[in-house]
Amino acid sequence: MNQTTIAKEVKGIGIGLHKGEPISIKLEPLEAGSGIVFYRSDLGISYEAKPENVIDTQMATVIGDHRGYVSTIEHLMSAINAYGIDNVRIVLDANEAPVMDGSSIGFCMMLEEAGIKELDVAKKILVIKKSVEVKEGNKFVRLSPTDMPIINYTIEFDNPIIGKQNYCFEFSKQNYIEQIARARTFGFLKDVQALRAMNLGLGGSLENAVVIDDNRILNPEGLRFKDEFVRHKILDAIGDLTLLGCRVFGDYTSYAGSHKLNHLLTKELLKDPSAYEVVSLEKSTYKVYEKVFA
């Protein structure tokens, strides 16, 4: 099985979640071995989507350096992972990816329009060989060896609308599109107001987030899934793990995880070469792992 890129260039436009300004986005094909690269056209600077380039995880996953940064990359990265795309250049004219509708379905539609092109170099996959875990109080994220890639995610909020939710996701592109891609980011009205006081979250609205005010959902259309909150956390986790550079063949388990914990997990994993193996999917090995690309 070979690496892929997109078959043709596609363009889109959206709003930035934090600045609230229009953002142009363009996806361009790249050759094998290039990986996922973000290009700030307004600065003329490129950033590879890798754990070592992450500079902030407080509100979103942010890559960059002293010259500039690209924020809120996780939803786009999640869609790229689901479509099995190894190499693509993302051109942005601002410091964040557009929020779209708060989920990754808009990016999935862009990738559908672009199509997928197979390249002439074998695809790689990261196989988990032993468990790696990161904890913060009672919160944790863990990667473990498995025969089938599973994401088992639990969240628990002191709010009756969310409460405790668990979702077990068996990874495949079709499952992702049906179960995960449409799950939107969410937040509490009081937090939105605090963010705006700091000149952040200016692009957030009921058009691109589920907003909760005490015991009610403000979005007139309600939820897309009864457990949309935990499904979106899975969407985020997939995006964060994509910074490892290839699809992860492992069992990801989380209780109250976050962008911060996901980033620390990728760093902890890469510190221990015995915890993983990067496998080249030549014909002789592909059958063992083909389920992850179903």
From Swiss-Prot:
Active site, per annotation: H259
Cofactor(s) it depends on: Zn(2+)
GO cellular component: membrane
GO process annotations (BP): lipid A biosynthetic process
Gene Ontology MF: a single term: metal ion binding
Keywords on record: Hydrolase, Lipid A biosynthesis, Lipid biosynthesis, Lipid metabolism, Metal-binding, Zinc
Pfam family, one: LpxC
Record InterPro entries: Ribosomal_Su5_D2-typ_SF, UDP-acyl_GlcNac_deAcase, UDP-acyl_GlcNac_deAcase_C, UDP-acyl_N-AcGlcN_deAcase_N
Enzyme Commission code(s) on record: 3.5.1.108
Pathway in which the depicted protein is active: Glycolipid biosynthesis; lipid IV(A) biosynthesis; lipid IV(A) from (3R)-3-hydroxytetradecanoyl-[acyl-carrier-protein] and UDP-N-acetyl-alpha-D-glucosamine: step 2/6
Binding site for Zn(2+): H75, H232, D236
Enzyme class, first EC level, given as a word: hydrolase
Reactions catalysed according to its record: a UDP-3-O-[(3R)-3-hydroxyacyl]-N-acetyl-alpha-D-glucosamine + H2O = a UDP-3-O-[(3R)-3-hydroxyacyl]-alpha-D-glucosamine + acetate
Function: Catalyzes the hydrolysis of UDP-3-O-myristoyl-N-acetylglucosamine to form UDP-3-O-myristoylglucosamine and acetate, the committed step in lipid A biosynthesis.
Protein family membership: Belongs to the LpxC family.
UniProt cross-references to NCBIfam families, sorted A to Z: lpxC (TIGR00325)
Name the UniProt record assigns to this protein: UDP-3-O-acyl-N-acetylglucosamine deacetylase
Source organism phylogeny: Bacteria, Pseudomonadati, Campylobacterota, Epsilonproteobacteria, Campylobacterales
